[in-house]
Curated annotation (Swiss-Prot):
Subunit organization: Heterodimer of LeuC and LeuD.
The protein's name: 3-isopropylmalate dehydratase large subunit
Pfam family, one: Aconitase
Taxonomy, superkingdom: Bacteria
Top EC category: lyase
Length: 418
């Protein structure tokens, strides 16, 4: 049988023959992941199961990223519980404090995920690693606890939707715009329990970091996973992080449930309007919407390429009076590289608030909460009502370039208009 990428990866991790979508299979996992919000629940379930040790201390990752630095007593208690569990179990990949970053930016940077892996995480944006050619998906904490104990889990083999992006990307149009275009087309449930497989000339032209941006938001269309073939760019990325991976692609003749094609030629940057990621419009149609806050960072767009994109727009310009522009490089590695390249100086001179590697305001956690009636544009992945604070606030989603341009203009703006 010719396999899609999802089927091909799952097949390599099970002893059962995968012959059709919808089949239930037991698969070995390459990595089980949880964070400071979800790990305590997973630990509770782990102990309730009677488990005494994790299946492999090198294949469990616990990343304290959502409320870091701990914002209150409750979050400090969550981290303390997880820290003690990690010590008890001898977990190799426990990250907190100065070596911690936003999990879905940190783990690829450390070489802990790569092509052909099966990764389960107690976080919905675990699908990010599909940008590297891994079958990665978000689980509930209880299922992750089972994977931590057993080293395996079950899957229903998902059907696959193939999304092909053709043409050449115009200036200021990038990965964030491509995934917003797809979500705008099929809706937030358009890929419900489907794997999304991305290809085409525009996809091949993207950096690995750009591909991870797209994979990150597969879940915003309901996707079980968002997958990219592992090509020369992928292998160069993982090799630089100490891995030895092989090329990986779908089999010729694989069966897809649906095939979509998008021509990116002449595209304008896109913005997702409140209160769903599917409410997508060209930036020109929302130009002029006033803003109180801009957030540049997150597991979607907090990598070094995103910092460079934002700095290109902000250099020599000032953030508009009355606008808070918060920049959160996603990992210590990104922070150090941004400092080395002078990007941090650019942000500071522009009047930005530059903070630590944290999820922070993305989930309405801290470091940038919106009040009643306030409006933000962010490079994050969700804009549900109340996502960044008050139920009476609004969040628009966009690329780092559009977010930076909007910070300067004080209104939603095209970076080419400055």
């Amino acid at each position: 049988m010719a396999h899609t990428l999802a089927q091909k990866i799952l097949q390599a991790h099970t002893d059962e023959a995968i012959t059709a979508a919808g089949q239930i299979v037991r698969c070995r996992v390459s990595l089980a992941l949880a964070n400071d919000i979800t790990a305590p629940l997973a630990i509770k379930s782990f102990r309730a199961m009677g488990a005494k040790k994790v299946f492999d201390r090198d294949k469990v990752a616990l990343v304290m990223d959502h409320f870091t630095p701990q914002k209150d007593i409750a979050s400090a208690q969550q981290v303390k519980l997880t820290r003690e569990f990690a010590r008890e179990m001898g977990v190799t990949h426990y990250y907190e404090g100065g070596d911690c970053g936003v999990e879905h930016a940190l783990l690829p940077e450390l070489g802990l995920v790569g092509p052909g892996d099966v990764v389960v995480g107690a976080d919905s944006h675990t699908c990010t690693y599909g940008g590297l050619g891994a079958f990665a998906t978000g689980f509930g904490s209880t299922d992750v606890a089972g994977a931590m104990a057993l080293g395996e889990t079950w899957f229903k083999v998902p059907p696959t939707i193939r999304a092909t992006f053709t043409g050449t990307l115009p200036k200021w149009v990038g990965a964030k715009d491509l995934i917003l275009r797809l979500i705008g087309e099929i809706g937030v449930d358009g890929a419900l329990y489907r794997a999304l497989e991305f290809d085409g000339a525009a996809i091949e032209a993207l950096s690995v970091e750009g591909r991870m941006t797209i994979a990150n938001m597969a879940i915003e269309a309901g996707g079980k996973a968002g997958l990219f073939a592992a090509d020369a760019k992928t292998l160069a990325y993982t090799a630089a992080r100490g891995r030895k991976d092989a090329p990986l692609s779908a089999d010729p003749g694989a069966t897809y449930e649906r095939e979509l094609t998008f021509d990116v030629s002449g595209m304008e940057p896109l913005v997702a309007c409140p209160h769903l990621p599917e409410n997508v419009k060209p930036v020109g149609e929302v130009r002029g919407v006033t803003l109180d806050q801009v957030v540049i960072g997150s597991c979607t767009n907090g990598r070094i390429s995103d910092m460079r994109e934002a700095a290109e727009v902000l250099k020599g310009r000032k953030v508009a009076k009355g606008v808070r522009c918060i920049v959160l490089p996603a990992t210590p590695g990104v922070w150090k590289e941004a400092l080395k390249e002078g990007l941090i100086e650019t942000f500071m001179e522009s009047g930005c608030i530059v903070g630590p590697a944290t999820c922070g305001p993305c989930l309405g956690g801290h470091m940038g909460i919106l009040a009643d009636g306030e409006r933000a544009i962010a490079t994050t992945n969700r804009n549900f009502r109340g996502r960044m604070g008050s139920l009476e606030s609004e969040v628009y989603l966009a690329s780092p370039a559009v977010a930076a341009a909007s910070a300067v203009a004080g209104i939603i703006a095209h970076p080419g208009s400055l």
